[in-house]
């Protein structure tokens, strides 16, 4: 599924930030919010597919490509989502793009353009959909 989607069904997943959880000692994890220092939205490299759902309905699914972490993200997790620089988005979406060239786009985004900060554990529940989920509880890491 992923190989075909990588070749033929690439997309951008637009966001203004994302969460990642840092493992602590034991089973606890600390949530972090990561965003561009500029605060502007960005595009993740994504792939999509249509699957047959129940009763012959079609179910659209997508996944965000990941890569090894940059210096900032390595402090939090062992991988990170692929954030495409603005000048490479069209190339990612180009149906004629060469597969090896596309693989070359799956690299860590520059650390110096990102910030990460600890947020409340409110984010751990999907029932909590408020600005409190992205408010810093500690100063930003950069």
Would you name each region that the model predicts?
Residues 1-142:
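A structured binding-face within diverse protein domains that lines the active/interaction site
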């Amino acid at each position: 599924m992923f190989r075909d989607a990588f070749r033929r069904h690439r997309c951008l997943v637009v966001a203004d930030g994302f969460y990642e959880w840092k493992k602590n000692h034991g089973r606890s994890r600390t949530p972090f919010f990561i965003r561009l220092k500029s605060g502007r939205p960005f595009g993740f490299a994504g792939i999509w597919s249509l699957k047959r759902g129940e009763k012959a309905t079609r179910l659209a699914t997508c996944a965000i490509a990941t890569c090894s972490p940059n210096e900032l993200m390595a402090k939090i997790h062992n991988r990170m989502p692929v954030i495409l620089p603005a000048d490479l988005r069209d190339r990612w979406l180009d149906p004629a793009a060469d597969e090896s060239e596309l693989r070359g786009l799956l690299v860590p985004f520059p650390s110096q353009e990102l910030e990460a900060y600890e947020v409340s554990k409110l984010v751990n529940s999907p029932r909590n959909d408020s600005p409190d989920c992205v408010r810093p509880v500690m100063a930003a890491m950069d």
